């Protein structure tokens, strides 16, 4: 019996050595002129982690200034807009935080190569009468009459979470001069409300019925959530209010996007919403943190059929500090959707100073 087994093993070994090896080839997918849809896996699937946004270069596209400049240590992408074939970035620059900040203008024909438009800021914190410490550009529009609008938020305390409100400034051209409205356009909620301490980081889009603003809001705990407001003229705003909630912290208004469940990567904060209305619905890129201290931040993706009810992507997080070489943190970001390409402009923190990097993804984002 033992001899039979040994003979069988010898035959198998000889067969394996003399059989031709199977060659594995990979055939590239056929080229297509249609945009590739980025789809969400089902709740029961376990997809491999994919890189949604790809950094176009390890180097920043917009650096901070020299040691003696107004933006010598920090710069972020502030408000970014694509208009008449040109990219405009109203970037924030500052030397410390929290400290006075200024807004500079850079432009680009393609989103990749940027040119500074003058050495000096075009809009300053001192131009906003009610800004106590700092003012940060956050969103921009070009109105039907050709006027330009920047929506900004203030930082009014050296403590955390500092009080902040949302304001608006206008100009006849992107270079200014910029004139801030005398009063904020979106104020804090009443004491005890979810946004009683901060309203900040607005993103405003124009729709067929008017304007929609998504913004971050926080109470004294500092835990930020995402709210929504609507307007017919871009000046007077009404916060979204779910009539089913009648007690604080949701008596006056309600967030449309809450923090993630305990233990999730975005369980601490969800903020800095960047929202787009597409043919298939609404898309939001947002920043999340694991705890209320703002640690372990990353960017997430969510979609909605109506701009109010949102579903997180199973691909989250879609961008982290590790995606920028040597970056310890990612702070402020902005996103543009131009011709089926999402341009992600992100403030990367390397060696305790920040510069602006670019990552992109192409194709439709669908539920």
What are these regions (language model features)?
Residues 1-5:
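Positively charged n-region of N-terminal signal peptides that target proteins for export
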Residues 7-15:
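Bacterial N-terminal signal peptides
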Residues 17-20, 33-367:
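Carbohydrate-active catalytic/glycan-binding domains of CAZyme proteins
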Residues 24-31:
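Ser/Thr/Pro/Gly-rich low-complexity linker/stalk segments immediately outside membranes or between
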